[in-house]
Amino acid sequence: MVRSVWKGPFVEGSLLKKADAARASGRHDVIKIWSRRSTILPQFVGLTFGVYNGQKHVPVAVNEEMVGHKFGEFSPTRTFHGHSGDKKAKKA
């Protein structure tokens, strides 16, 4: 279900503080975050966030198309190794 409009987008408070500090300093360091559930806001465009996927921080460079999505969508938590091939086809 979609979040109701009157509530507004959810963003972790500490994330807003980190983003504002990064904008004020003018530095383009990776901002480490653990809040995968936070919504990407327009003020985050141009910043790079390190989104934690359970093992490491995956760098996510925010652009305009990402606004409105969640940070967790851009940091996969599971590794797909592929399906095994058909062994009978290799012998033929």
Curated annotation (Swiss-Prot):
GO terms for molecular function: rRNA binding; structural constituent of ribosome. GO terms for cellular component: cytoplasm; small ribosomal subunit. GO terms for biological process: ribosomal small subunit assembly; translation. PROSITE patterns: RIBOSOMAL_S19. It holds the Pfam family Ribosomal_S19. Keywords: Ribonucleoprotein, Ribosomal protein, RNA-binding, rRNA-binding. Protein S19 forms a complex with S13 that binds strongly to the 16S ribosomal RNA. PANTHER family: RIBOSOMAL PROTEIN S19P FAMILY MEMBER, SMALL RIBOSOMAL SUBUNIT PROTEIN US19M. Belongs to the universal ribosomal protein uS19 family. This is Small ribosomal subunit protein uS19.
